[in-house]
């Protein structure tokens, strides 16, 4: 299994319950599609380097997990994160061992 890290930026004006539901939903997408050893946590609310969708800051969330390279977890997360309006940006990185 390969270790991956996902960083995504959540819009700053989301309420706490909606943010918790969003994080739970996307963590579920990863685990339901073959990811293991998921560790998910909020990083912090930070000022953005440039404006994204009229927002000047965002809530950074980071998730680390292990998955097979052929796993659907990465492609499904990427597909749904692009559609979701609460996620401003996301990045998936393969962690070197």
Swiss-Prot record:
Keywords: Ribonucleoprotein, Ribosomal protein, RNA-binding, rRNA-binding. One of its GO terms (cellular component) is ribosome. One of its GO terms (molecular function) is structural constituent of ribosome. It comes from the Bacteria. Transmembrane segments: none annotated. GO terms for biological process: translation. Belongs to the bacterial ribosomal protein bS6 family. HAMAP family: Ribosomal_bS6. Binds together with bS18 to 16S ribosomal RNA. NCBIfam families: S6. This is Small ribosomal subunit protein bS6. It comes from Lactococcus lactis subsp. lactis (strain IL1403) (Streptococcus lactis). The gene is rpsF.
